[in-house]
Amino acid sequence: MIRRMPLDAAFFRELETHLHRRAVRNSLEEVAELLADDFVEFGSSGRVYDKAQAIAALSTDEGEAPKVHDFAIKALASAVVLVTYRSGRGDQFAWRSSIWRRDDGKWRLTFHQATAAAR
């Protein structure tokens, strides 16, 4: 039986958007702490990233933080949460889904997918 945990959308929105901040994206240590060792991302470009590749890509990202819309969360298990939202910069938008997993008391991003979306 899965024990239900209280879901705090504001907490998960902060976790997710923390990675959108340039200072965080450009910090190898902060990103490494937030991403699980088995992290995988399917980017809107069609590329697949593991943890090391994602850290390298984020470390050189100089873009502004995207606007976030339609944010939602759903518990998948007692220590696993699905986050979904739409984000965009300029005229480029994507639907995003992330899976956050609590390991040793810390929430870490284990999966992320971005799918190009119409504005």
What is each model feature region?
Residues I2-E33, D38-R119:
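A beta-strand edge to alpha-helix "cap/lid" segment located at domain peripheries
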